[in-house]
């Protein structure tokens, strides 16, 4: 069996917790980590838009990750869906405020994109679900590949998408998820 994931956002200012079930415009989207952690995935893009200039604690919680402190909070509710969006990470940075680091999205995309042979299609694994996942490696469909040991490295950290990195933060774009 494969492990399925839901996304949890926690706003420290308002204390609001949101649990997302990966539905986009009331349509089911694939739930395994490797199935939906793609650059142009509409669900992941909608989550990025929700944290645009609004830091949240972010966690992609697997249904096998029962050691997670809010496992029941995530898996005992249906969760909410998102609306499709045109939001993209072009020209933006993914910021981890707890660690005072950022990932330059344009650089990351250029380093990690892969072209389908004989096609113009570009594939790139999205760093946000991978960096914030808990439970990876326990089911089929989980990420196994380059920098696998870094999956979950930003789990439940305070993260936002910004146009510019904060001045005193360090560039950590050297992630290779392929």
Q: What label would you give each PLM region?
A:
Residues 21-24, 31-35:
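Catalytic toxin/effector domains delivered as secreted proteins or via bacterial secretion systems
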Residues 1-25:
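Short, extreme N-terminal segment that most often corresponds to the first beta-strand
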Residues 32-178:
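Low-complexity intrinsically disordered segments
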